[in-house]
Amino acid sequence: GNVQEVMDLSPVAHLAALEGKVPFINFFDGFRTSHEIQKIAVWDYEDLKDMCDMDAVAEFRRHALNPEHPHMRGSHENGDIFFQHREACNSYYTALPAVVEKYMDKINAKLGTDYKLFNYYGAADADRVIVAMGSICDVAEEVIDYLNAHGEKVGLVKVRLFRPFAAEKLIEAIPASVFAVYNELKKDEMKRQFTIGIVDDVTNL
């Protein structure tokens, strides 16, 4: 997203990580967004404090490595036991989208925004959409406005949470009128995988 969205959504990653007990990578377009000079509305720390669950912070600190109460991590396991432990954490990842939505809703209430796991922009009756994330979204919105003003019916789905991927929320965000993604729709034989804006003559995706 843009610089303002980075500011607004960074607390979501931290707060959801604390409550969900799952590590997050809070990422954005490194050069495009980090080197852009824009005026933004900066968060007040008191607003952040209101949203922060201090019990969750205390619980997080209790699990930190400490010589006063040592415990072992990263011990060796055979494949069968490791697989069971790996699957045991699935419930945390399954619950995580709801936790992220909870904090997005709190931010929406404070800022008057409308952040969701997937935000739709464009024609309500679009027949083609792009699904994208990052700084491309602002550019895509301008293109969508232009195309729709000239008789097209197109839209954009902005991805806010990439992993774990909430497929059912993506489906909810796409208008029912959509029947294909991007201009591949117009071809007799559509590609199932392709990179937007790049003619891939190396891997031919």
Model-derived segments and their meaning:
Residues G1-D8, A88-V99, A132-S135, F162, ...:
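Catalytic cores of large soluble enzymes that bind and process phosphate-bearing ligands
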Residues A16-G20, S34, I40, Y121-A124, ...:
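Solvent-exposed alpha-helices and their adjacent loops that cap or buttress functional pockets
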Residues G1-G30, V42, M54-D55:
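Conserved thiamine diphosphate
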Residues D105-L205:
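Thiamine diphosphate
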Residues A13, I40-V42, F179-A180, D200:
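Short basic, glycine-rich beta-strand/loop surfaces that mediate nucleic-acid
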Residues S10-P11, H35-V42, E142-V143, R192-T195:
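Short acidic, glycine/serine/threonine-rich loops at helix termini
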Residues E5-A16, K102, K106, E142, ...:
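Alpha-helical scaffold segments in soluble metabolic enzymes
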Residues F24-Y120:
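Conformationally flexible catalytic loops at phosphate/diphosphate-handling active centers
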